[in-house]
Structure formats: C-alpha cells, structure tokens
Amino acid sequence: MNLRLIFILCIASLFAGCATYAGLNFDQLFGPQLVRERTASVETPQADFFQREVKPIVDNRCVVCHACYDAPCQLKLSSVEGIDRGASKALVYEGTRLTAAAPTRLFEDAETTQEWRDAGFHPVLNERDQSMAANLEAGLIARLLQQKERHPLPDQVQLEGFDFSIDREQTCPTIEEYEQYEKDNPNWGMPFGMPNLTNSEYHTLMTWLENGAIMNMHTPISDQEQAQINQYETLLNHSDLKNQLMSRYIYEHLFLSHLYFSELSEKPRFF
C-alpha cells in the first residue's frame, strides 16, 4: 500500500469519524433519531396554520426547485409526504452507473417514511426529541434557513461562488454533516442562490419548524368525488386498442397537471 493511498484512507476515516461524533452529540443532546408523526386533522389549528400560512411560502419560494423527481438531493417539497421523506445523496442521473438503480418514486416505491429511511433518505426535519430547541438545532431545513439569514445573498451584479449548472456536483449534507457544510459553503443557505425570504416569511417558517413542523392529513374523498373518479377511470381503462391509444395521449398531456372537478363545487379541490 503506497503512502498516497494511506493518506487518502486516513482523511476519509477522519471525516467519517467527525460525522459519527456529530451524530453521537445530537443523540446525547436530543435523544435518538426516530420517525415522527407530523400530520394532524385538517380541522386542527396546526394543520390550518400549515395550509394557510406555511404552504403558500413553500410553494412560492421552495417548490420552484424542489418539486421534480430530479430535484436537488431528491428533496420534493411539493407534498406532505415529500417533506417528511427528506433528502438523498443518491444521484438520479449517473452516467457511469453500470446497473439499474432502485427507483425512488414518491407514492410508488415506498409507503412510509421509515421505508424511505431504510432506502437511504435522511430527514430534513428534526426526528429527535420534539422540543423547540431540538426542532431548530437538529432540523436541517431550520439550520439552512438560519444560515441564509446570517449570510444574505451577496450584493453582486453577477453572483460568484454559485454553480447553477445541471451537471454540478451534488452536495446533500445530513444534519450530522451540516456544520462542516456551513463552514465550507457559508453562502449556501436556503433558498440557494436566491433572494432571502422576507422577515414575515422567515418567521412564519421558523415558527412552524420550532413547533414540530405539523402538516395536514389529506381530506377524505367525498362520495361525489369518488363517483367522478370512477367515471373517468372507467373511461380511461377500456381495453380496446383505440381507447388505449386515446388514454395514453390524454395521460401524456395531463400527468403533470393538477386536476379538479369544476361541477362539484365553486371552490375547486385539486388532485
């Protein structure tokens, strides 16, 4: 074994040891990491606060980058399940991959947050003791938002130190790796490379995170909605070739859309 290889292995061991120490430190401070129940009935104040105050900010400032299957770190913030699932270091597109990767389609390839943890996804919300201090200190989103407040977007005509290219190197720290991430990239708080949140937006999100990041359960489908769904599913699932072609054409034009049944209520419910 040559000296260069020994040096590389020592450095790798050092970083691995640092991450392990950080994890142990969080465990000592706030207890072990466990998947938490974060949804509440839509009638509760917590769920109402998420729907009325938090979700519009997330949709306006975060979802623009974190909505697709190939979002940075596979973090999809467009749904309750995506937020709770968290992020992954695995690349969606990897040109050097020689074998097929296990797909990570939300709602398809795992049903619970724990199953996503087993598949390699790490939390972006605090999963240790649910205290206000722990929710901010051991929650990745909270830390990244605070980082942006400490290091606002530089006042530059052309930003320096930000790589927006499609093939840029992916950086997806866990909460245990966050301190090193901030030291290495102080200006990489969230929203990445974008203007800071307004004071109101920032305090709204931090209040939500501090109180456990409670989100809403899904509203049950009504009998009228289910009847409409059944009608369209019957239409789109005829087995003859002509209807198969028609259904495929319709699907290819609608699968990215949010659909609603306009005749059922004045205020549409999107699916």
Predicted feature residues:
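N-terminal secretory signal peptides that target proteins for export/translocation
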Residues: 1-3
